[in-house]
Each structure stands twice: as C-alpha cells, then as structure tokens.
Amino acid sequence: MKRLFSGDFAHKVGYSLISVVIFAIFFAGMIFLTNPTGTILDTGWTLETAEDIRAVTLPYTEDVDEKVTRTYRVTFPYVDADTLVIPRPSANAMLVFLNGQQVYSTGNIRQPTANIWNMLHLVSLPVNLMREENVLEIVLGRDNTIGLQVYPFLASRQEVFLKISLANWLSSDFLLIAIGAALMIGVFLIRLSRTFKHRQSPEVFMGHAAILSAIYCFDF
C-alpha cells in the first residue's frame, strides 16, 4: 500500500488533481463571467425573415444552408442603462439598431465570415436615443446555424466592462496563447523523441496530440 501511494505515482495523482482543480476554476469562472445581469431581455422577441414575422422564445437558433439575414426585435421600457450585452450570437456578422438608428456593427452582413460567435459584444447605447418605449433590433448574418443562444441584457458599462473583457480574454486571447503553447510543446516533444533509441516513445504521441489539438482549436 505504501508503494502504491509513493514516488512517481503520488506525483502523478497530485498533478492530476491540480489539473482538475484548475479546470474547475476556469469553468466556474466562465459561467460566472457570462451570467446575464441587469435588465435581461428574455421575453417579447419577434423574428423577421424574408418570408414572415413571428414571435420566438429565446434561446432560438435555426439551421440554414445558404447566406441569410435574420432580424430579432424586442420592445423594452426606459431603463437606467447605457450598455447592451449580446453574448455569443450564432452569426458571422451583426448589426444593432436602437429606435431605428444603427448603434453597432461587426462583420460584413452581405458576406458574413467574421468570427464573432465566441465573443460577448458590448454595445454602447446613446442616451439621446433612449425613449419611454424603445425598439431594439439585432440583425444577424450567416450561412449555417444562426440565432441568439443567450439572452441579451442591459446594464451599466461601469458594472460589466471588466467582467465582459475578462470573459472575452479567456475565450479568445487566452485560447490563442494556448494554441501557440501547444504547437511549441508538440514540436519540442517530437524533437525530443528523436533522441531516444525507441522511436515509438510516449513523447512522439504526446507531441502529435498537442499539435492536432492546437489545429482543432483554430476553429474557435
């Protein structure tokens, strides 16, 4: 029993537990950072397509096989907020209108190819456009699964800016750093395996796994 929990085995168990704890912290952090706050726009949505206008309940997505645009529209009363947060829309281009005035755009709505679906978008709402009753329109463009998977919400920029910025860093910039690190580690392990007599060493498989994982993550 002492041998079982000593030496290299104990170290491996310790490293495994540390990895699980780190993963749990990041996972819980992402849930906390992306949790809607403030005034959540969870009811009253309509969807306008080229064929009709119909009421929908968020989250709502649909699968398409050609480039389309979808307009999500909701009416809300005046609230003390200056920022709209749109979490990870299923789209490659987006326009936002408040009371008929464009207040935000990202990607090319005619040729939607931008990677905007893994970001939480902060949209500034000009105070002079706010009324007692406000109409918000979110226009999405894409050629596959399209829609809103998370409720947009209204909040004070001061309250959400740091949280949203950190969430975007973890889901975008941090991922790029991890991809670069995985590529470097993969190349290093493959080169290291060539110094051993046995070509089929664990390092060569770990190196290829790291490189393939980095390539897969490029999709995000």
Which residue ranges define each predicted feature?
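Intrinsic-disorder/low-complexity, polar/charged segments enriched in Ser/Thr/Lys/Arg/Asp/Glu/Gln
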Residues: 66-75, 81-83, 120-122, 133-135
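Beta-strand-rich ligand-recognition modules
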Residues: 94-153
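Alpha-helical transmembrane segments of integral membrane proteins, especially early/N-terminal helices
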Residues: 134-142, 195-208
